[in-house]
UniProtKB/Swiss-Prot annotation:
Family as reported in the entry's similarity comment: Belongs to the peroxidase family.
Organism for this UniProt entry: Caenorhabditis elegans
Domain of life: Eukaryota
Active-site residues, as the UniProt record annotates them: 271 (proton acceptor)
Keyword field contains Membrane: no
Keyword list, A-Z: Calcium, Developmental protein, Disulfide bond, Glycoprotein, Heme, Iron, Metal-binding, Oxidoreductase, Peroxidase, Signal
Name of the molecule in the record: Peroxidase mlt-7
Statement: the UniProt record of this protein carries the keyword Metal-binding: yes
Length: 724
């Protein structure tokens, strides 16, 4: 019976192999001897070992499988042995067919002396898991590193899957079916998955992409199920009126120390952590609400914007709800972790769009003597007729050329690191190079975020709301809070300026000049034909950042010619059922305000409190976005107490609940961790700009007269990644 079971399994797999073809070529015959071997001599002797293991053959045919499928069944007990020169074949099922790549290993050609170490090699990744704080060293000396994840039998989603689902009225969540972190333990101990699964080995779906946001409070809907706040019961002013009266202002107050990179890095980070699925805006053609799909913002008689008045409303599509979930919840398409999702995407099914085949590099395009993100050159014949969009891990890379510039910088940084790793380790596979470079880039982003950006944003609140790192906590869930992504971290829209300058090497305006904000939206041609990313980055670093407490007319009156970003933020909060400002004050340990003057502890300006009283019925009606933006900033920071609380709480969980946070022992070797601590945004700019010679040591500070040569900015020593 067992032999029959195995034969039926074999027949089933042969049927699959016959059905799926790649580029009109059938797959090569299975390898049946030493298909995959570790350096300790343990092998899977058949190409289908993992398939048989996935359907229970390790138990059903224990004797045969124990001997012949040692890796798939986890039955290897062999002692350490020399590296075997074997042919390895990696196969995976990606939903559209089997993808197979074969590489030939010629074995070691030189004798390498391993330096003395207190660690001794182990024979399995389960043993490494028992010494997790030394995982990186153990995996290396035991030669257990596997840069390819086994996804066979696991459900995966892609951006295309979500896009195809939206017209049905709802979107699916990523299922936990087939998610077994033990199956690819040697991969999971060293590298992140693209979709964030198995970061927490015991709770593998925490922080994963294509899952619902968390909440600090239950969703606040008019009907308790999904109707937006103030849609059935007119309890609040329209989002447009609230923004126009309370937040929109042509007055710009700038910071005396921080530069515009604070604004741009914040947007870059927000796209790393979350992306909400929206209903198609084409569904919203009138000023009448469409159930579950459209929630237009009416324009009042007193509104001075004649363009808005002529259209009578601002058309707003709702976020797509998750299927079969009530009350209504929204989907996060990105992972919750600081992992470079905006660079690499959040699904293995999408990676081919960004990665250069099976090499260690990201795809780039050489255009006008600069390496940029891939784009369709047929749509960019000249600067006056350029409608091309860059391809990146997050489609929003094209929203603003400042954001595009950071995307380009980090794609170049990945490839710079990948090139160096290839030179240091010529025997590494493309998969190994790619995963190591991706891991390093993610760690650099974390270092810049927690050591450079957040202390400036949060000022004296940083130590209280985030504090020093005390290690990975398996009980901390990094999943993004709806209150954070929908309201709190949209504070950065208040930092957007009317005009941005572009600066040359000498500190002068470039020939093409600066640009108004609206002229930098979806304008890739300005990068491709007007000097590249350098002048944009220099302009950001030499211009004081606008304090975020008011919103410039560039985004409240002129955004894309027909909408108001501030009103959109308020409306999105109501769409998602975000609790009121008063409720979030309580979450942050402040007293509940019974009168509008009770807000005086955080909103010192009595005129602002009076404005709230004129526009809102009660203190419990004030939108979180509006109230928090009006708060006076904390000492040394850019945001007020409630925002610093909501933002800090999320970033603390994103750090402490991330097994791959770079300071967590075992993720990198000790020497590698010390190198990552040397990284900085200034160094990344110096290494990847087309022509940068002088830079502020801290990329977020105005340079004054203290510019530093790039040669004196500390840099990582990538030789610490040379394999033994």
């Amino acid at each position: 019976m067992r032999r029959l079971h195995r034969n039926l399994s074999l027949l089933f797999l042969i049927c699959i192999l016959n059905e799926y073809r790649i580029e009109s070529q059938t797959l090569s015959p299975p390898i049946t001897d030493r298909f995959k071997c570790l350096t300790n001599g343990c092998c899977d002797h058949h190409e289908w070992c993992r398939f048989w293991a996935s359907i229970g053959e390790c138990n059903a045919n224990k004797d045969w499988m124990t001997e012949n499928c040692q890796l798939a069944c986890g039955t290897c007990t062999a002692p350490a042995a020399p590296l075997l020169p074997v042919t390895t074949t990696a196969s995976s099922f990606n939903g559209g067919g089997f993808v197979q790549t074969t590489t030939q290993s010629s074995g070691p050609t030189t004798t390498i002396t391993i330096p003395p170490s207190s660690l001794t090699s182990v024979t399995s990744c389960e043993r490494v898991k028992d010494s997790i704080a030394q995982a990186s060293e153990l995996m290396s000396i035991s030669r257990l590193i596997n840069p390819v994840e086994d996804n066979f039998g696991r459900n995966m989603l892609s951006i295309d899957d979500i896009t195809r689902s939206v017209p049905t009225g709802c979107v699916p969540q990523l299922s936990d079916v087939g998610v077994d972190c033990r199956k690819s333990l040697c991969y999971h101990l060293m590298y992140r998955t693209l979709d964030g699964t198995c970061n927490n080995l015991e709770k593998p779906m925490q922080g994963a992409a294509f899952r619902r946001f968390n909440r600090h409070f239950p969703a606040q809907y008019d009907d308790g199920k999904g109707e937006p706040i103030s849609s059935l019961n007119q309890s609040r002013p329209s989002a447009r009126e609230a923004n126009r009266v309370m937040l929109s202002s042509a007055q710009s107050v700038v910071h005396d120390k921080f530069n515009n990179m604070m604004m741009q890095w914040g947007q870059f980070m927000s796209h790393d952590m979350s992306k909400t699925t929206l209903q198609p805006s084409a569904n919203c053609k009138t000023c009448d609400p469409v159930p579950s799909k459209c929630m237009p913002i009416p324009i009042g008689e007193k509104d001075p914007n004649l363009g808005f008045k002529s259209k009578q409303c601002l058309k707003v599509s709702r976020s797509a709800p998750i299927c079969r979930v009530e009350p209504r919840e929204q989907l996060n398409e990105n992972t919750a972790y600081i992992d470079g999702s905006m660079i690499y995407g959040s699904s293995l099914k999408d990676l081919h769009k960004f990665r250069d085949g099976r090499t260690g590099f990201l795809r780039v395009t050489r255009f006008n003597n600069q390496n940029v993100l891939p784009f369709d050159q047929s749509k960019c014949a000249n600067k006056d007729k350029c409608t091309a969009s860059f391809t990146a891990g997050d489609i929003r890379a094209n929203l603003f050329i400042g954001l595009s510039s950071l995307h380009i910088m980090f794609a170049r940084e990945h490839n710079r690191i990948a090139q160096k790793l290839t030179e240091l380790n010529p025997t590494w596979s493309g998969d190994r190079v790619f995963q190591e470079a991706r891991k390093i880039v993610g760690a650099q982003i974390q270092n810049v975020l927690y050591k450079e950006y957040l202390p400036k944003l949060l000022g004296v609140s940083f130590d209280k709301v985030i504090g020093p790192y005390k290690g990975y906590d398996t009980n901390v869930d990094a999943t993004i809070a709806n209150e954070f992504t929908t309201s709190a971290f949209r504070f950065g829209h208040g930092m957007i300026e009317e005009f941005y300058k572009r600066v040359d090497l000498s500190g002068n305006n470039i020939t093409h000049g600066g640009f108004f904000f609206g002229d930098g939206v979806f304008k890739s041609g300005k990068i491709l034909f007007e000097g590249g990313v350098d002048p944009i980055i220099r302009g950001f670093m030499t211009t004081a950042v606008k304090r975020p407490h008011r919103m410039t007319p560039a985004i409240t009156e002129k955004m894309f010619g027909s909408t108001d970003l501030g009103s959109l933020n308020i409306q999105r909060g109501r769409d998602h059922g975000i609790p009121s400002y008063n409720k979030m004050r309580q979450f942050c340990g402040l007293k509940s305000a019974n009168t509008f003057d009770d807000f005086a502890d955080m909103i010192l300006d009595r005129n602002l409190r009076a404005g709230l009283a004129r526009n809102y019925n009660t203190t419990n009606d004030v939108d979180f976005y509006v109230g928090s933006m009006l708060e006076d900033p904390v000492i040394g920071g850019l945001v007020g107490t409630t925002l610093s609380c909501a933002i800090g709480e999320q970033f603390k969980r994103a750090r402490d609940g991330d097994r791959f946070y770079f300071e967590n022992p075992g993720i990198f070797t000790r020497s590698q961790m010390e190198e990552i601590k040397k990284s900085s945004l200034s160094r990344i700019i110096c290494d990847n700009a087309d022509n940068f010679e002088l830079v502020s040591q801290d990329a977020f500070l105005l340079p004054g007269s203290n510019l530093t040569p790039c040669s004196k900015i500390p840099k990582m020593d990538l030789s610490k990644w040379r394999a033994l």
